[in-house]
Regions:
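Acidic, low-complexity cytosolic segments
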Residues: 1-28, 35-140
Length: 140
């Protein structure tokens, strides 16, 4: 069994690999629980990189949820523009998020669209109870 970080390859990994391979300029992708536990990662990410990206995405999404509860509405997607690219986090399912890193050449509209499609495909099937990795269920 191939591993690209501390967890064995699972059903989420191949979806993330597909996203990275299909969408130009996406370099990394991670599914995570809202409390920062990595649930799946694209190829090429070691344990430290996966855990770091998941922790950053969790903190970023927490800020977005706080802002949206203060100002109204739900936090759907948050974007940080850096000189080297973009960091994008989207709510994915109950208690989960999708985070991607891109290069600066990325078409953010296309990336956001592809993330939304992936979230639509998986969001209803992802259920995570906080503080436990074993709480991930993929239902049919």
């Amino acid at each position: 069994m191939e591993t690209n970080h501390r967890y064995p390859v699972n059903q989420l990994d191949w979806l993330l690999d597909d996203l990275v391979m299909r969408v130009p300029h996406i370099t990394r992708a991670v599914f995570l629980s809202q409390d920062g536990l990595a649930l799946g990662a694209s190829r090429g990410m070691d344990q430290a990189a996966t855990d770091h990206l998941a922790a950053l995405a969790s903190a970023f999404q927490s800020l977005a949820r706080s802002a949206s509860s203060t100002f109204g509405g739900d936090a759907r997607q948050s974007i940080i523009e850096m000189t080297t690219g973009f960091f994008i986090v989207s709510a994915a399912g109950q208690g989960t998020c999708l985070a991607v890193l891109t290069t600066s050449d990325a078409d953010i509209g296309q990336v956001a669209y592809e993330m939304a499609i992936l979230v639509q495909r998986t969001g209803d099937h992802l259920q995570v109870n906080m503080r436990t990795r074993s709480a991930l269920f993929l239902t049919r």
